[in-house]
């Protein structure tokens, strides 16, 4: 530790800390434009100048490390004069168009001009004009406002791993630009909007729609993937105007994906507002009572409870999943499947039940056991059947962050992917995994030397008919590596669905496994209840009676005989469990449109009509039930600590097909019903396909 004096206050700081960090430690905020705690130090705006004893001139506090007994002064006439001079130079070419700038009210330049700026200018020449750049459908550029802090350049290069932004020209002609008019091709591009201290980079979808002081904010989480990024929903009236990231060091730091940030316009399109039934091939809007009675009538025609099937969608909350499971159990069915692991639902005589994972009673068999914040402790990474850049962009940034620290290697088994760090592909062949498990592959030597290896298994593995066997094969590595020790667990299942871990916590762990031969016998009519399931494909769907409960008119609604309008994640207070097992809550920002209701309330009302009444009249009743079956679901923003059990790996006896892994999805922007209803996401999809 080093002792320094800031404006006469003594403070101890870590050796190597900067003057700016020392000032922050005693509560003195130093003005800055280019400095950001998550980016490398540039030191090019000079706004953070301070006076240091025995220094001939002011120094940049963001770049100067402290020394023992250093005396720092932040509020002297020299410092004020220096900051005023720097600000005057920054305003020389600034257009001063605050009334029409979307950054107004949230602009660092605006705020600091109020403190250090003058009421008149001394520059009487023509201001420099800079042509605006087209860097994609999400980020609007007004480059005349740019002050060359280079935050966007450093973010793109260091965090996003996409060096598309840079500086061109020199001196007065310096500009921030892309290479030969290329778009900024990153899943995290929207974060440069938050980083920009002026109005040079703003949101295209949000442009000219609202001012920050008109908005009401609600703290919530994102459900577009299984990371559970913390977000802030800004609303005016009953319309979402924008979504911003919320700081959570343990989950998303302060970044969010473009899908989380910009898909919100899909929440006002293709919405289901009223119950609908299909009679004689025609859809009719009806009351809730008539829709429930129509379900009861058709359910009574199903004589065998084995013909009652439920599918849990990717965006569903834990409370609704619990009631859904209990309702189907009361109807005599245990056939409840996860949409994320059952891409195709075939109903035939050759079907048989199986578990997604063996030992699903133990939580560490189906979650990512390495907390996101501890990924930086790993010293080697093996990716199996996953394109982590598309399936979990914020997990990808964590791995890239560790990669940039050095002495880190990333290997993959599966298709070759364009990740944001160097990856050695070991092949897309099951025989490669077999060689690794038997210790015959050259990679095994590196794996054995690793003290804290990280293994990440993708969702595509769970969708394979031999997925359970592949996971058990990977577990045989425990016997000669340190993947799982008394103080480290590097075994991770990467889910891509926000509902998967919560559903598995509630015991919904079965999926469909089929024999190779498909039966030609007549398919009996099934009662299929889709709870927000829009990604699943049902063979011979016209032969069955299908109930769809959800919020968008997507695939599920198109094949349904009854449509029950539910609430989106922005319209309900609900519980979700992320990929690492962390329990988090969404908060209602406004009411659902029309006659749509919260999903758990719909299931509760339906149970009464079906004479299978569920004993839950309030949210508190459901949480009381959690206390007895899964008490960890009540511990918000916490990960239930699981005792690390070192398994005695048995010889592998499973059957695995020698078929390579396939991409889970190729289009990052259209992975759920909300995104597919979003015009912004559609633009992204079409533009980035061409690039």
Swiss-Prot record:
Subunit relationships: Complex I is composed of about 30 different subunits.
One GO cellular component term noted in the UniProt record for this chain: mitochondrial inner membrane
Subcellular location: Mitochondrion inner membrane
Binding site for [2Fe-2S] cluster: 34, 45, 48, 62
Residue ranges occupied by any 2Fe-2S ferredoxin-type domain in the UniProt entry: 1-78
Keywords tagged on the record: 2Fe-2S, 4Fe-4S, Electron transport, Iron, Iron-sulfur, Membrane, Metal-binding, Mitochondrion, Mitochondrion inner membrane, NAD, Oxidoreductase, Respiratory chain, Translocase, Transport, Ubiquinone
Cofactor note: Binds 1 [2Fe-2S] cluster per subunit. Binds 2 [4Fe-4S] clusters per subunit.
SUPFAM superfamilies linked to this entry: 2Fe-2S ferredoxin-like, 4Fe-4S ferredoxins, Formate dehydrogenase/DMSO reductase, domains 1-3
Protein species of origin: Reclinomonas americana
GO MF annotation terms: 2 iron, 2 sulfur cluster binding; 4 iron, 4 sulfur cluster binding; metal ion binding; NADH dehydrogenase (ubiquinone) activity
Cofactor(s) needed: [2Fe-2S] cluster; [4Fe-4S] cluster
Protease listed as a keyword: no
Any Pfam family matching the protein: NADH-G_4Fe-4S_3
Stretches assigned to the 4Fe-4S Mo/W bis-MGD-type domain: 215-271
Function: Core subunit of the mitochondrial membrane respiratory chain NADH dehydrogenase (Complex I) that is believed to belong to the minimal assembly required for catalysis. Complex I functions in the transfer of electrons from NADH to the respiratory chain. The immediate electron acceptor for the enzyme is believed to be ubiquinone. This is the largest subunit of complex I and it is a component of the iron-sulfur (IP) fragment of the enzyme. It may form part of the active site crevice where NADH is oxidized.
EC number: 7.1.1.2
Biological process per Gene Ontology, one example term: ATP synthesis coupled electron transport
Catalytic activity: a ubiquinone + NADH + 5 H(+)(in) = a ubiquinol + NAD(+) + 4 H(+)(out)
Entries under PANTHER family matching the protein: NADH-UBIQUINONE OXIDOREDUCTASE 75 KDA SUBUNIT, MITOCHONDRIAL, RESPIRATORY NITRATE REDUCTASE
Enzyme class label: translocase
Identification of the protein by name: NADH-ubiquinone oxidoreductase 75 kDa subunit
Predominant subcellular localization, coarse grouping: mitochondrion
